[in-house]
Design a protein with these regions (language model features):
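Conserved HGGG/HGGXW glycine-rich cap/lid loop of the alpha/beta-hydrolase fold
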Residues: 11-65, 69
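Active-site loop/oxyanion-hole signature of alpha/beta-hydrolase fold enzymes
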Residues: 53-99, 276
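Conserved hydrolase catalytic core segment
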Residues: 90-134
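Flexible "cap/lid" loop of the alpha/beta hydrolase fold
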Residues: 118-161
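Alpha/beta-hydrolase
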Residues: 139, 151-219, 226
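Short beta-strand/loop motif that positions the catalytic acidic residue
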Residues: 224, 230-232
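Acidic catalytic loop of the alpha/beta-hydrolase fold
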Residues: 235-238
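Catalytic active-site module of serine/aspartate enzymes centered on a nucleophile-bearing elbow/loop
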Residues: 254-288
Length: 288
């Protein structure tokens, strides 16, 4: 498959995706909702897999839906399926990060016959009041965890403001401001991570989708028969080991990997360890 940018039309809407790497196909759905796809690039993993990074509708050069309320998990899953069908592979490996993991779970439940494997990366099986209470409680501890970093003190308020951003420029600015909260220790690797931070982009409309009910698939996950890898960072304030354990316990035969020196962005914090975990899992899957 030719590397670089591709575009197709699904249900009358432009869907962009980007191809890099070599080996079996892996479709990767970024988080957010509304984050630009670029942060999810995984060069180390591209040595083992042909990575197909989706640029979700509502972001970047992909199309927009007529009404922002229509940005829902089932819609993103439908577009993910459209890309999989376009690629023509009988079965594909799907990786979902954070909110993209919600999309991947929905996809796995709706299209089990098209999956070769499922990688649930820094995500959770539920998005409810308890999830957010736990995340905000963890976030309040961030300044104490980084007492020598003045920037850490304002992160809780900055995070809340980012969630309430009124437009694309504001949410992009907010995301760049709060990026350190997604890492175990951003400042220890600032020289390497600062360019990623400066390049972050986000779009506000996908935040305003209206789900018919809060996301909660805990009772459905036992039906997933596809090989699954659940992976997160030990210091992920948002989708850490608690939620990874719930996913692992709920999905029969799943594998669990906790990266001890990572937060929410293990592919950037421990790229080699992350790549080994995913490539090792992929190598055990049936030929596809």
């Amino acid at each position: 498959m030719q590397h670089g940018k591709h575009a197709i039309t699904i249900d009358g809407v432009r869907q962009v995706f980007h191809v890099f790497g070599t080996g079996p196909l892996c479709l990767a759905h970024p988080g957010g909702p509304g984050f630009g796809w670029e942060y999810l690039r995984m060069p180390a993993l591209e040595q083992h897999l042909t990575m197909v990074y989706l640029e979700p509708i509502g972001t970047g050069d992909s199309g927009r839906l007529p009404a922002r309320r229509d940005y829902r998990l089932d819609v993103w899953a439908r577009f993910l399926h459209g890309v999989a069908e376009h690629l023509g592979a009988p079965k594909v490996l799907v990786l979902g990060h954070s909110h993209g993991g919600f999309v991947a779970q929905r996809y796995a439940l709706e299209h089990p016959d098209t999956l070769a494997g499922l990688i649930l990366y820094a995500t959770a099986p539920v998005l409810d009041a308890d999830f957010w209470a736990a995340a905000m409680s963890n976030l309040e501890l961030f300044p104490q965890q980084h007492p020598d970093q003045p920037e850490a003190a304002g992160m809780f308020g900055a995070y809340q403001a980012t969630l309430a951003a009124p437009d694309d420029d504001a949410i992009t600015h907010g995301l760049r401001r709060i990026m350190p909260v997604y890492f175990a220790d951003y400042w220890a690797h600032e020289g390497r991570l600062a360019p990623v931070r400066a390049a972050l982009r986000a779009w506000v409309d996908p935040l305003h989708g209206e789900e018919p009910a809060p996301f909660d698939v805990r009772r459905q996950l036992s039906s997933i028969a596809t090989p699954a890898l659940v992976l997160t960072g030990e210091h992920d304030f948002l989708c850490g080991p608690r939620w990874a354990a719930e996913l692992h316990d709920a999905i029969p035969g799943s594998q669990l990997t906790i990266l001890e020196r990572s937060g929410h962005m293990a592919h950037l914090e421990e790229p080699e360890a992350f790549s080994r975990a995913v490539a090792g899992f992929s190598a055990k899957l049936p030929a596809r």
